[in-house]
A protein has these predicted regions:
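Core catalytic lobe of class I
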Residues: 1-201
Length: 201
């Protein structure tokens, strides 16, 4: 079965995962920034945290902007390099894994359940920015169209950069994609004042 044919099941399973997820227990006694701003720094499962915000902190429909930078479906295990002060040696410790036993469908279910939670958190004038790259952004766009509605797609922003090498098998992959969605047509947008100069590629 093709991945496109699995999209309805992925959406259904993600909705069930969101509904069955219990709010995490987070210590809110530590805040970041000015004490009266209500900023929270949290460590834990982000789906459980969003359910905590929705059900415990009563933040449903109160968030104006969400920026999310999920794993890119690279099929790689990532490590962090830490320098040990005593020996001046570098050691590698596991950071996170972007490998998925069930492939694309498992990854899409994981992200889809979280996108559903994000929509619940967004205010009527709220926006969502999803940072991705070439690996799987085309499938995420389909899921976002289903969750937020095709008419609430505002922009695709292409972020180009110069780092990375070249290949003998394909053009260099030197850009990321940001998908910009609104919850409704009431979203806030500040027009760009500075013109973009045309440059030759």
């Amino acid at each position: 079965m093709s991945l496109i044919a699995k999209i309805p099941d992925i959406l259904k399973q993600a909705q069930e995962e969101y509904e069955n997820c219990r709010p995490g227990v987070f210590d809110t006694s530590y805040q970041y920034g000015e004490s009266d701003t209500g900023n929270i720094v949290a460590e834990g499962d982000n789906l459980e945290f969003m359910k905590f915000l929705i059900e415990t902190m009563d933040m449903r429909g109160k968030v104006n902007l969400i920026y999310v930078d999920p794993p890119f479906f690279t099929k790689i295990k990532y490590e962090a390099v830490v320098k040990m002060p005593a020996t001046n040696e570098n050691i590698s410790i596991p950071a996170y894994t972007d490998k998925w036993e069930e492939g694309e469908a498992e990854y899409l279910r994981m992200l889809c359940s979280r996108l559903i939670a994000m929509k619940e958190l967004l205010a009527e004038d709220g926006c969502l920015w999803v940072h991705l790259d070439w690996h799987i952004s085309h499938y995420i766009k389909i899921l976002l169209d289903e969750i937020f509605g095709y008419n609430n797609f505002v922009n695709e922003i292409v972020w180009t950069y110069k780092s990375g090498g070249s290949s003998k098998r394909h053009f260099s992959r030197k850009h990321d994609t940001l998908l910009f969605y609104s919850k409704t047509k009431k979203y806030y947008f500040k027009p760009q004042k500075r013109k973009i100069l045309q440059q030759r590629l």
